[in-house]
Amino acid sequence: MKIVWSPQAADDLVENNKYIARENPDAAIAIVNNIYESRKRIREFPAQGRVVPEINQQDIREIFCGSYRIIYQIEAKRILILTIRHMKQKLTKDNL
């Protein structure tokens, strides 16, 4: 399945990276690399992620990558990464 990043998810990745890089550039690089590596798990086993409890829709799932939640939607021909949130950040439908 093809993986597509929503504009929101791409912005989240950039903003999270900038925030972390201010204090620890090496950690920022490692987190981005780990998030990109997580795409392989999502692509190979999209249903493996758990249903996002705040949304409670079967097609919207998440996997964890360190302290981050990668939230994605399983569609017929692609997987859409909706957002990347730190575990401490509140998630609402408006964030998707």
What do these predicted ranges mean?
Residues K2-D59:
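Basic, Lys/Arg-enriched alpha-helical interface segments
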Residues A47-K77:
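Basic/aromatic recognition patch in beta-strand/loop cores that engages polyanionic ligands
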Residues C65-Y68, Q73-L96:
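Enriched for short, Lys/Arg-rich terminal
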